[in-house]
Design a protein with these regions (language model features):
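Core nucleotide-handling region used for phosphoryl-transfer chemistry
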Residues: 1-175
């Protein structure tokens, strides 16, 4: 991969940060936040970084299953967060370059919103509840990580132990 849109290869820079700590048969997926040289990676979003700085936020990890098969084990989000926190704890020099993901809520949406009836357009109604839930998700609020005034992008939903390893993004309207 070459530099492409940016003046340098931001993906190689991010890979170089994490590569020494990634085990064989382990794949780490991450979001690169901040700046790629003089350009914001996501226009209008500094994520607390000064121009020219960035950090990597691992959000997904897969490893080879212990049974020796070629099937990958998909880590749950708590495991990804814990791996990242341990990495930074063991290597404090990475604290500004690697950040753990924020988990806004861990549990079922039926438990979070017991008043939303499963039998009455549950999918639509629970998404509406989430969009209006400032306590848990802060949708349509300013992104607290940013120094500049930018609205949150949204949230990602994942199901623990999902055999399909799906992720769903609920984007903020202001994004």
């Amino acid at each position: 991969v070459g530099p492409g849109y940016y003046d340098f290869d931001i993906w190689k820079e991010a890979t170089d940060i994490l590569a020494p700590y990634i085990d064989e048969d382990m794949t780490v997926y991450g979001e690169i936040c901040g700046w790629a040289g003089e350009k914001a990676i996501q226009k209008g979003y500094d994520y607390g970084c000064k121009q020219g700085e960035f950090f990597v936020m691992p959000y997904r990890i897969t490893t080879k299953k212990k049974d020796g098969s070629d099937t990958k084990y998909e880590w749950n989000v708590d495991e990804v967060r814990q791996w990242t926190e341990n990495l930074v704890k063991e290597h404090p020099e990475l604290a500004e370059k690697v950040h753990p993901i924020t988990i806004f809520y861990h549990g079922t949406l039926a438990d979070l919103y017991p008043n939303v009836k499963v039998s009455e357009h549950w999918h639509e109604n629970v998404l509406q509840e989430m969009m209006n839930d400032k306590e848990h998700f802060g949708m349509e609020e300013l992104e607290p990580m940013c120094k500049n005034k930018s609205y949150r992008e949204g949230i990602v939903l994942r199901i623990d132990d999902d055999p399909f390893a799906e992720a769903f993004k609920l984007k903020c309207k202001n994004f």
